Amino acid sequence: MSRRVKTLLIILAVLLVLAIVAVVILNHPTFGRRMSKERKARIEASLNWRDGMFQNQIPTPQFSGDKSMFRALWEFLTEGKKDRTPKEAVPAVKTDLKALPTDRDWLVWFGHSSYLFCLDGKRYLVDPVLKLEFPVTVMMRPFKGTDIYSTDDMPVIDMLIITHEHWDHLDYATLRDLKDKVKHVVCPLGVAEYLEYWGYDTKHITEMDWYEKVDNITCLPSRHFSNRMFKRNQTLWAAFLVESSGKKVYIGGDGGYDQRFKEVFEQYGCVDLALMENGQYNKDWANIHLMPDDLEKAILDLKAKQVFTVHHDKFSLAPHAWTEPDSIAHDIAERNSISLLDQPIGTVVEF
């Protein structure tokens, strides 16, 4: 056998192995499954579905600079500040969540956009990412000290709220292990396909379009996008408003600045607590994540009585210093006399 033929066979063998590995990985449950015809029909009937995908309320190019998508991604991977990750463990407190009383309103943050709050006697868990497994660990690694909570620590959850399908908000391993503790799930259109595939009972899932209200929860617009594999914007992204007999909590989800924050105030009045995205921003994707100046405008538009910022302190998904979002939030609060609830991971914050 000639050297040329041997080389060709080796190349073919390597390609075959890579193809097999790709098939195995892409068939992992974390990637979901093909959407059912019934769900697809409901999605396509949405007023927010146009030209084969969900659309934002205003035009939203994913990349806002003059660079190509590939150049922006390359710079993100190869450049940026050296202090994107902490050198020491991030401060965190281990709280017995099951022992927390339900006769008071409180919040416990787990880093990034995962948090548990109690409102009017009910426990709400938002975007829990607590138990990363392969292949997600290839893309995201939590900062040291931020992974002290597991699904075993969670109490019974009255309502699980998912804002969108991105990896840092919808985690297969976490939701798989939480299933028996969750009474009901609320999510934007299309996201329930993942949950049903992962074992959640359809009867206990409510999919919502923007401005739909079910019981005390209203699904509201955000300015973002979705893609978990290759095709973009096939599931919806959202913010949520949770109301009780005396208070309102705004769950901002992910998304760039637009008129929606003013509209929330105009339609629903002052919210008692606003959970605002603050982190993983960059000028190259300023349309789909809140930049620091936009965070300030959004908070002022909302006129929230109290603010807690999330989307930071756990993963490095943008080229800013990991401590920068906290500093920005404090500066905004000081300039505008805003009540900022800023506590370490795991701390019980009453509101």
Name each region found by the language model.
Residues 23-45, 49, 56, 159, ...:
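Cap/insert and terminal regions of metallo-dependent hydrolase folds
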Residues 2-134, 139, 188-253, 272-279, 327-348:
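Metallo-beta-lactamase
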Residues 46, 138-186, 269-275:
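Active-site metal-binding motif and surrounding structural segment of the metallo-beta-lactamase
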Residues 128-130, 165, 222-224, 253-255, ...:
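Active-site metal-binding loops of divalent metal-dependent hydrolases
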Residues 114-118, 215-270, 286, 290-294:
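Catalytic core of the metallo-beta-lactamase
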Residues 117, 127, 164, 171, ...:
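Divalent metal-coordination and catalytic microenvironments
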Residues 130-147, 227-231, 282-288, 316:
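Acidic/histidine-rich helix-loop elements
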